[in-house]
Swiss-Prot record:
Region forming the signal peptide: none
DNA-binding region: 276-310
NCBIfam families recorded: DNA_bind_WhiA
Keyword match Cell division: yes
One example GO MF annotation: DNA binding
Known role: Involved in cell division and chromosome segregation.
Family statement: Belongs to the WhiA family.
GO biological process: cell division; regulation of sporulation
Identification of the protein by name: Probable cell division protein WhiA
Domain of life: Bacteria
Organism: Geobacillus thermodenitrificans (strain NG80-2)
Keyword presence, Cell cycle: yes
């Protein structure tokens, strides 16, 4: 079972107060419901491939409203041939949609979120929970990128959803138009964790955070190793260049031509090619020399080698 499926399964087992029940149902019916008329009677079908969500919708309807509700199971005949669960509302459908602020009763639908539904903080959380159950998905935190999104068919609802997430919970949600609708999405791991907490997915939150901590620690270690490797490669490259320059000087004019301070460092570098500048400074006979002091002398040796290669004269008095 995917992380998103486990999260939704957890949410379908939560207890809910009546005011919150209305907010959650409003999101579920608005986003997954369809309306039809037959013989002057309105019917609402709420369709999902998730059995737990279908049971949740059925339970919320039976618990909170006096409506005729049925549950059907059908099998898809194409692609994956999964079961499709349909919660059908017949008697009382019109009054239910009005109470959930989905339908005005004048054959026009309300696509944004009514303030009447989300007066309380708990109801705001419940609406987001219903929206996630109806059209949400979240990446497994072990994958390469963090991503949570909620799909809406209508732009007005998508905009209202994003506003709810940002103005009341400061989630830094963004919106995006897709081919068949719109999404509100989160990309920051901290905000996704906050969202899971807001909608009551506490077990999913704990798993998300556990995986995120391990992943972040692994990434930190990898960055540290990469940094150390880069520094080591840089040090080795510099040492090899220094040795090459010293040997070139030795072959052309001889190391004895160098001033004493440079000659000493040149010989130490040839003898100890794998040590750091700090370690090299501790080997100087006249006393310890700082890393910057050793680096200064080696740069002077590099300059002498470059002038010799270019056929230019070398002023050893300026090389100290």
């Amino acid at each position: 079972m995917s992380f998103a499926s486990e999260t939704k399964k957890e949410l379908t087992n939560l207890e809910v107060k009546h005011c919150c029940l209305r907010a959650e149902l409003s999101a579920l019916l608005r986003m997954n419901g369809s309306l039809s008329f037959s013989g002057g009677r309105m019917t609402v079908d709420v369709q999902t491939e998730n059995a737990a969500i279908a049971r949740r919708i059925y339970m919320l309807l039976r618990k909170g409203y006096d409506v005729a509700v049925e549950l059907f199971v059908r099998k898809k005949m194409r692609l994956k041939k999964n079961n499709v669960y349909i919660v059908r509302i017949t008697d009382g459908a019109a009054s239910l949609l009005r109470e959930l602020y989905i339908w005005n009763g004048d054959f026009s639908f309300v696509h944004d979120i009514s303030p009447e539904l989300i007066k309380k903080k708990c109801c705001k959380r419940s609406y987001l929970r219903g929206a996630f159950l109806a059209g949400g998905s979240v990446n497994n935190p072990e994958t390469s990128s963090y991503h949570l999104e909620i799909f809406s068919l209508y732009e007005e609802h998508n905009r209202s959803l994003c506003e709810l997430m940002n103005s009341h919970f400061f989630l830094n949600a963004k919106t995006l138009e897709r081919k068949k609708g719109f999404i509100t999405y989160l990309k920051e791991a901290e905000k996704i964790a906050e969202f899971l907490n807001i909608i009551g997915a506490h077990q999913a939150l704990l798993r998300f955070e556990d995986i995120r901590i391990v992943r972040d620690m692994r990434n930190s270690v990898n960055r540290l190793v990469n940094c150390e490797t880069a520094n080591l490669n840089k040090t080795i490259g510099a040492a090899l260049r220094q040795v090459e320059n010293i040997r070139y000087i030795d072959e052309t004019i001889g190391l004895d031509s160098l001033p004493a301070k440079l000659r000493e460092i040149a010989k130490l570098r040839i003898e100890h090619q794998d040590v750091t500048l700090k370690e090299l400074g501790e080997m100087v006979a006249g006393g310890k020399i700082s890393k910057s002091g050793i680096n200064h002398r080696l740069r002077k040796i590099d300059e002498i080698a470059e002038r010799l290669r270019a056929g230019k004269p070398v002023d050893f008095h300026k090389s100290l």
